[in-house]
Amino acid sequence: MPEILDKVDRRLLEELKNNARENIATLSKKLGIPRTTVHYRIKRLVEEGIIEKFTIKPNYKKLNLGTTAFILIRYDPDSGLTQREVAEQIARIPGVYEVHLVAGEWDLLLKVRASNAEEIGRIVIDKLREIRGVGQTVTMVSFVTVKEEI
């Protein structure tokens, strides 16, 4: 189990979250610690699994994927498939970016991206609803994303 992060580790994570490509020298100046310390701390955070990967944040509008929708799904237990098996099939659908098993009235929560609402509809009608184990669905198209973190 990794130790609790100190203030420097938290600041370093915040800087890397804002720009994973930030170089060691710049991070050293921003944090007020030696470059070797920055390098060591990043390496330790990776080894301890606190940092799983360094990634990018795409501009989905420029990729013609500017429409985001959240879809709630009721699992059909009479399908002969487990809820996890249904979730794994859903995860393979192009345009599905997140699949969550959730508690409450609904069983799964999806985040879907497409070029427009019509394309979201095609994903729901032609792909999702064809999967055995998918019961009722509710689709909510996002007007605007106020905050989205990686």
Swiss-Prot record:
It comes from the Archaea. Keywords: DNA-binding, Transcription, Transcription regulation. The keyword Transcription applies. Residues 5-66 form the HTH asnC-type domain. GO terms for cellular component: cytosol. GO terms for biological process: response to amino acid. Residues 24-43 bind DNA. Signal peptide: none annotated. PROSITE patterns: HTH_ASNC_2 (PS50956). Pfam families: AsnC_trans_reg, HTH_24. One of its GO terms (molecular function) is sequence-specific DNA binding. This is Uncharacterized HTH-type transcriptional regulator PH1916. It comes from Pyrococcus horikoshii (strain ATCC 700860 / DSM 12428 / JCM 9974 / NBRC 100139 / OT-3).
